[in-house]
Amino acid sequence: KLKTIDYDAIVIFTPHWQTYIGTHFLGLPEFKSKSVDPVFPNLFRYNYDLKVDVELAEAMHEETAKAGIITKMMRNPDFRVDYGTITSCHLLNPSWDKPIVTISSNRNSHYYSNEVMIEQAKALGEACMRAIEKSGKKVVLVSSHSLSHRHFVTEAPLPEDMSREHIYNHSQYVWDMKIIDMFRQGQMQEVVDIMPEYTEQTIAETEAGGLIWMMAAMGVPSYPAEIYGYQSVIGTGNCIACWDPNTETRELVL
């Protein structure tokens, strides 16, 4: 899909860069290091060398601050970029020929509630939208997280045991199917409305605010999403979906 459209940068909101005081943006032109997954160090080790659109990141930082949200630019050259950013950007654009902007997830749901998280994520998304519009750049927005997030807590004797390749339980699956059906119907405002209950019932990674941020930054789409797939990862539910605002390039993908 991305090979068929013209864009200047990828803007990604990641739940795996968790900040507890404000929202942070990568703020140096380049980050280069080795990422080792803190959960599965035996499975994920990645040498990255990524470029950041600092101008756009600073514009988002400024607009976010104007909205009353505490913000900070990450300018530590030794900062380890999170694996959510790395895996999502690599799978979407393995050539890494576009600059990125990475946004941290401020953990309001931990301090307060899912409702507070939603309001903050909305304000952040709207601020980012204003910054993008003022910049005149074309960007791809990425929300990197699972849907339902209950997962197995013991490892099978055979690491790739296919009998364990399923959603944790049926209630998680039913919730995910409900959300995906609403994606297909273009009912994104309704998704936003039920997000607190969905997040609580499924322990979803939506609790970081990524999906709400993206919907707010897109003006809450009312058109259908392109659904590319749904699959389990150690019991969690994962959906690949795309909201294309261009009616000429939007496809019916079920």
Feature map (PLM): residue ranges:
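Beta-strand elements within well-structured catalytic alpha/beta cores of enzymes
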Residues: D8-T14, I103, K137-L147
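Flexible, D/E/H-enriched segments
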Residues: K1-D8, Y20-A123, T154-L254
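Non-transmembrane, aqueous-exposed alpha-helical and coiled segments at domain scale
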Residues: E126-S135, V139
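Short, internal active-site loops enriched in acidic
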Residues: P15-Q18, H145-R150, A156
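Short, hydrophobic/aromatic alpha-helical segments in well-folded domains
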Residues: A59, L124-C128, S144
